[in-house]
Amino acid sequence: MSCILTALCKKGQANLNSLIKLQNKKVKNYYVKNNETAIDKMLCIAADIKGQVEQLELVNQYLGAPESEKLDFVYDCSDLDINEKDLKSLCLTKNIAYFTQKYNAPTVLKAQAAVYDSFIKHSELFINAICQMDEKQQVNNFCLDELVKLKLIAIKHLCALEYVIENSI
């Protein structure tokens, strides 16, 4: 079993537990104080939870998977819903405008500044993970589990930014 993926799983579970506790606290405060601004914060936390759950489901799937499955996972980018040319371009430019344009974020999230900031944060973190993955793929002696980990991190952030767009007011 992979130490890298096991550590990612443990860290992810701890992070998910913290996010759920934080979400419960925000929901309780929302109803006690009837604070409308808390809605945006709850959406951001819910997006983080969604991304973390997706990552945990996949890390458990690949934890004991054979190398051939892991290689397929790492090199098949269809699950990212971004073509390979655009991924390469993102790594070269690190331009988050790709996501803001793709999801029309400035318009969709116009009235929700905190949610837009969360969208931008997840876009940047996705690009960072994909770029790290691309750099490590260029090395002859790469660690496959490290590549799986980086793709799982990218998926977590992609799910979170998509959740924000799909569930904004």
Swiss-Prot record:
InterPro entries the record matches: Pkip-1
Pfam families: Pkip-1
Function: Plays a role in the stimulation of the viral kinase PK1 function in very late transcription and in expression of genes required for budded virus production.
Quaternary structure, from the entry: Interacts with protein kinase PK1.
Protein name (record): Protein kinase-interacting protein PIKP1
Organism: Autographa californica nuclear polyhedrosis virus (AcMNPV)
Chain's gene name: AC24
